[in-house]
């Protein structure tokens, strides 16, 4: 896995992480997770290990409402495999300097894209998605 960039956002702790896809005439290959790559980029996002892994498919014009976890709190690493979604993040943390702030991240992904992005949604933040086309 090759992380190309790691950028902070206007919400404390929310990161936009871009990673490389390996392309050739057959399509693309992506190593979806390698813990050491996150640590090498000072992205220690999983101090307790990865707790859960999910995938979804959503049809065009679907809205998946704001989701968050309590007891235990859980951060989320969100990406589009193929399709187009906007991910919304809302900071619900009472002790956060960005409490109440909401951001939208446009996350299109085509099979021919040489890179793709994740949004890191830290514990205490809610997120939801709107899908502009059928999306994996």
Predicted regions, residues:
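Non-catalytic, conserved peripheral segments adjacent to functional cores
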Residues: 1-113, 133-135
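Ligand-binding loop in jelly-roll beta-barrel domains
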Residues: 124-136
């Amino acid at each position: 896995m090759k992380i190309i960039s790691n950028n902070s956002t206007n919400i404390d702790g929310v990161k936009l992480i871009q990673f490389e896809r390996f392309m050739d005439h057959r399509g693309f290959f992506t190593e979806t997770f390698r813990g050491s790559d996150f640590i090498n980029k000072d992205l220690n996002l999983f101090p307790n290990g990865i707790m859960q892994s999910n995938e979804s498919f959503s049809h065009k014009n679907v809205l998946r409402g704001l989701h968050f976890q309590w007891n235990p709190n859980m951060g989320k690493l969100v990406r589009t495999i193929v399709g187009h979604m906007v991910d919304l993040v809302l900071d619900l943390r009472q002790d956060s300097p960005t409490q109440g702030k909401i951001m939208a991240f446009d996350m299109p992904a085509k099979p021919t894209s040489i890179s793709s992005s994740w949004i890191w949604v830290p514990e205490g933040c809610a997120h939801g998605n709107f899908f502009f086309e059928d999306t994996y």
